[in-house]
């Protein structure tokens, strides 16, 4: 599992915040699971879970396109945080969006794959 957080401070764009959360998760971690098991990175199954206050406002195709390899599925949940912003006069000017992302990575392994790993020890 890889975790990240992203924001859109001034644009109130949920997709931008979600994409930044996925980029953040990728920068802090490594999707090195597949090569460690002698598989291709394209064999990985990646589920991206995004938490934002308005899940319906996230364009999932843009979020999925961030991952460089593997099959991708995006699941949206209500979460994250919207923080109101005020201008110099104290009037509301919009809000800052905080999105959370979790990337769940799975790899299908056969018994032969596991046996090969055991022999390599």
Question: Residue locations for each model-derived region?
Answer:
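Conserved mixed alpha/beta catalytic, RNA-binding, or beta-rich assembly cores of soluble enzyme
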Residues: 1-38, 51-59, 100-121
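Short, charge-patterned binding micro-sites
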Residues: 40-44
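Mid-chain, well-packed structural core segment of small domains
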Residues: 45-89
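C-terminal edge-of-domain segments
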Residues: 72-121
């Amino acid at each position: 599992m890889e975790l990240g957080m992203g924001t859109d401070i001034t644009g109130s764009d949920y997709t931008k915040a979600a994409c930044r959360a996925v980029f953040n998760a990728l920068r802090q971690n490594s999707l090195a699971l597949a090569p460690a098991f002698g598989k291709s990175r394209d064999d990985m199954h990646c589920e991206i879970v995004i938490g934002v206050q308005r899940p319906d406002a996230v364009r999932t195709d843009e979020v999925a396109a961030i991952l460089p390899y593997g099959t991708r599925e995006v699941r949206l949940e209500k979460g994250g945080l919207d923080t109101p912003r005020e201008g110099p006069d104290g009037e509301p000017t919009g809000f800052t969006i905080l999105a959370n992302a979790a990337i769940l990575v799975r790899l299908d392994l056969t018994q032969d794959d596991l046996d090969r790993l055991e022999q390599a020890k």
